[in-house]
Amino acid sequence: MLINPILETLDKFDIAILRELQADGRLTNAELSTRVGLSAAPCWRRVRALEEGGYIKGYRAEIDRHKIGLGVLAFVRL
């Protein structure tokens, strides 16, 4: 079985942090630390390290396209 070498550098807490932030990028550090089983300071340091390491590239909002008048999304290839 092949193992992704990148995953070998991430431990269970890093993966849990990534999973939680992917599900809800607006979590406070206090809520995130509770969900992953760390205290606040180590959780904050890990998030910063994941950002600096390029694992977390940014935080985004999911926009309701219909509410802002952009009902159709089309990909066109010529």
Task: Place the predicted regions along the sequence by residue.
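A compositional/biophysical signature of low hydrophobicity enriched in polar/charged and small residues
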Residues: 1-78
